[in-house]
């Protein structure tokens, strides 16, 4: 039996060898080194029919190797005759993000239009003079797009994200929704009901309440306007108010159409016919910030007490050195919660983690925050603590702010780590095409141009411990703004806390 099997294998080996010789007899590319195959596995023999990997194949053209360095795409900007800016940055990404940015937010609201920006955010991509809301939804779905709208104190933002094949449709849709809103009465009423629900929801969110409270208490005038409509103002909002607000503020010189992932010439050909007929009118002067400081307290039956201490950032983004220093300072101080749902390790070496959260189990959350605008801003610390520890937690916040006003208190290793973390955050965020588009739009509205990212990275590298101390000294010399929610009666008085900074 075994002899028969052996003879059959010998016959197979002979036939296979003949086939190999016939196939490659005319080729000079026969492998000189044997390699295994199916019959090698069966018989233990070797085959010499495989071409070596270093042998060039005939009629195969290799693509040129990628360069070691590719220069980043530059932002190209064109200003139309009516003052509207069109800006774009090309990329190899198959998708594009386009945004229409308007220099208009809650600081432009008047007593007659309080809450308009909140309602406008809800009314985005609703019916226009040319399309019903259903048609808008269907057209967005048809190309797999994603649209968003957001309102801030200084800007209204409308964005569209989809494959770059559909850039003409994206630009046309954005232009129609922003330029030609119908503000149908029934749609406005429907969204007002949703705004009321949001107001009720946010009233139960202490962190949101504190952020709005430090603005309303800290500023007199437009910068104190709430981003949220209130029960008192919502009943005055209607389609007429929205139409008048848009007509006054949505003007060509105050608009930027920005895109990431689009070739500029093609983008301009699509955008110019759709936006060049917007009226060119004189730009309204931006409201001046009036910072006064103040105290807001909301007594509530809650397990935790929430508080925030804040000071003005004079100059805002227009004071570049100070704003970059504050960005590093926020990363340096850091903070977070005593429990991290995303897992441990995030920000564990920041000052507020090491010196506060790791030392005081009664404190559940403690972090630095900032809200920076064109010409002003706020910087401070917010915390959440058990109610019986409220006074001590406020005292800890005071000590931490005073500590960084002394350059000897800022460890160089910590500062270097904060600068690297700040640069990493900027670069990683800019990898998102939506963030890149927003960065273009916001910079053009603020500076009139887009500074390259290297410009800001150099500014961050230049920050020193003395710069940190100098900025903090300016901060805490301005009037204190204090906001609290929960068992506020046990917290120290505004004057008591404010005097701590004056007597430092």
From Swiss-Prot:
Keywords: Electron transport, Membrane, Mitochondrion, Mitochondrion inner membrane, Respiratory chain, Transit peptide, Translocase, Transport. Its main location: mitochondrion. Its EC number is 7.1.1.8. GO terms for molecular function: metal ion binding; metalloendopeptidase activity; ubiquinol-cytochrome-c reductase activity. One of its GO terms (biological process) is proteolysis. Gene3D superfamilies: Metalloenzyme, LuxS/M16 peptidase-like. SUPFAM superfamilies: LuxS/MPP-like metallohydrolase (SSF63411). It comes from the Eukaryota. It is found in: Mitochondrion inner membrane. GO terms for cellular component: mitochondrial inner membrane; mitochondrion. Coiled coil: none annotated. It catalyses: a quinol + 2 Fe(III)-[cytochrome c](out) = a quinone + 2 Fe(II)-[cytochrome c](out) + 2 H(+)(out). Belongs to the peptidase M16 family. Substrate recognition and binding subunit of the essential mitochondrial processing protease (MPP), which cleaves the mitochondrial sequence off newly imported precursors proteins. Heterodimer of alpha and beta subunits, forming the mitochondrial processing protease (MPP) in which subunit alpha is involved in substrate recognition and binding and subunit beta is the catalytic subunit. This is Mitochondrial-processing peptidase subunit alpha. It comes from Solanum tuberosum (Potato).
């Amino acid at each position: 039996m075994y002899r028969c099997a052996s003879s059959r294998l010998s016959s197979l080996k002979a036939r296979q060898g003949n086939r190999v010789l016939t196939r490659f007899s005319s080729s000079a590319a026969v492998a000189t080194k044997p390699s295994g195959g199916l019959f090698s596995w069966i018989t233990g023999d070797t085959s010499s029919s495989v071409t070596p990997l270093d042998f060039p194949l005939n009629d195969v053209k290799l693509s040129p190797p990628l360069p070691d360095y590719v220069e980043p795409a530059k932002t190209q900007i064109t200003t139309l005759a009516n003052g509207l800016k069109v800006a774009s940055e090309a990329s190899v990404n198959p998708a594009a993000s386009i945004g229409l940015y308007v220099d208009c937010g809650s600081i432009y609201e008047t007593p007659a239009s309080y809450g308009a920006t909140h309602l406008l955010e809800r009314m985005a991509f609703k019916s226009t003079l040319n399309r019903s809301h259903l048609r808008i939804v269907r057209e967005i779905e048809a190309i797999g797009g994603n649209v968003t709208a957001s309102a801030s104190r200084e800007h209204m933002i409308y964005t569209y994200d989809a494959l770059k094949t559909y850039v003409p449709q994206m630009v046309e849709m954005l232009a129609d929704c922003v330029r030609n809103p119908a503000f149908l009465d029934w749609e406005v009423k429907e969204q007002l009901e949703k705004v009321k629900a949001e107001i009720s929801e946010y009233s139960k969110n202490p962190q949101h309440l504190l952020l709005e409270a430090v603005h309303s208490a800290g500023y007199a005038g437009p910068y104190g306007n709430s981003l949220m409509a209130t029960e008192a103002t919502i009943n005055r909002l209607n389609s007429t108010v929205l139409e008048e607000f848009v007509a006054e503020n949505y003007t060509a010189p105050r608009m930027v159409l920005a895109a990431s992932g689009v070739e500029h010439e093609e983008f301009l050909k699509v955008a110019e016919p759709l936006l060049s007929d917007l009226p060119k009118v004189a730009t309204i002067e931006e409201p001046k910030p009036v910072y006064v400081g103040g105290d807001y307290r909301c007594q509530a039956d809650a397990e935790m007490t929430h508080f925030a201490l804040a000071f003005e950032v004079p100059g805002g983004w227009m004071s570049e050195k100070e704003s970059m220093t504050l960005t590093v300072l926020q990363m340096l101080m850091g903070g977070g919660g005593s429990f991290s749902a995303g897992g441990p390790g995030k920000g564990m070496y920041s000052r507020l983690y090491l010196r506060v959260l790791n030392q005081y189990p009664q404190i559940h959350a403690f972090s630095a925050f900032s809200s920076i605008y064109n010409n002003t801003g706020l910087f401070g610390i917010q915390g959440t603590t058990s109610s019986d520890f409220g006074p001590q937690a406020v005292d800890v916040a005071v000590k931490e702010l005073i500590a960084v006003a002394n350059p000897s208190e800022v460890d160089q290793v910590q500062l270097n780590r904060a600068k690297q973390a700040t640069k990493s955050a900027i670069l990683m965020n800019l990898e998102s095409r939506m963030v890149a588009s927003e960065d273009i739009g916001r910079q053009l509205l603020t500076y009139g141009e887009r500074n390259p990212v290297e410009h800001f990275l150099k500014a961050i590298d230049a920050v020193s411990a003395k710069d940190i101390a100098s900025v903090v000294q300016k901060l805490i010399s301005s009037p204190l703004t204090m906001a609290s929610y929960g068992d506020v009666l046990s917290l120290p008085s505004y004057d008591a806390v404010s005097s701590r900074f004056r007597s430092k």
